[in-house]
């Protein structure tokens, strides 16, 4: 039963953004790379893949998996020079849950990595805390190489106030760098913790004072 529900990343091409053709990867399922072997941290599957074009012949796929050994989600990295043949970087996750008592001690997921400069990578990710089961927030980690990360001390965007459309949590971040060193953050908002049914899409903008502090954009 486990094999039938395992998720793996695929690849598709399009010339117009509307009509797509699947690329058949080397794995027997057609996936471009596989989950980890039994006992590996990502043995349960590959979820939420996001591609970063980091440089010439430097294409990176950041992904999440629930670590079979801990039951907590972590972030991994696969590398490719041509977009077709992939290899995982190392045998462990590159970014895992925070220490006990932190805002992300129950798991990290849905990574979205953006390169802002030669030596500056930022990763937006979905964070879970053991103190609020199922309620996700969005946090931002920083790195000089896109592999070793500095964890923030607090989330950049938290669940909405009681009664808000996103009171159940915010996640699935997608960041777009804007002019003036600001960042536009699209995210999934949930009405109930851990329940994506009826989820919607929200947008927040970084503030002038701090590009890692975000304010929701509300309808006029």
Describe these PLM feature segments.
Residues 1-220:
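Carbohydrate-active catalytic/glycan-binding domains of CAZyme proteins
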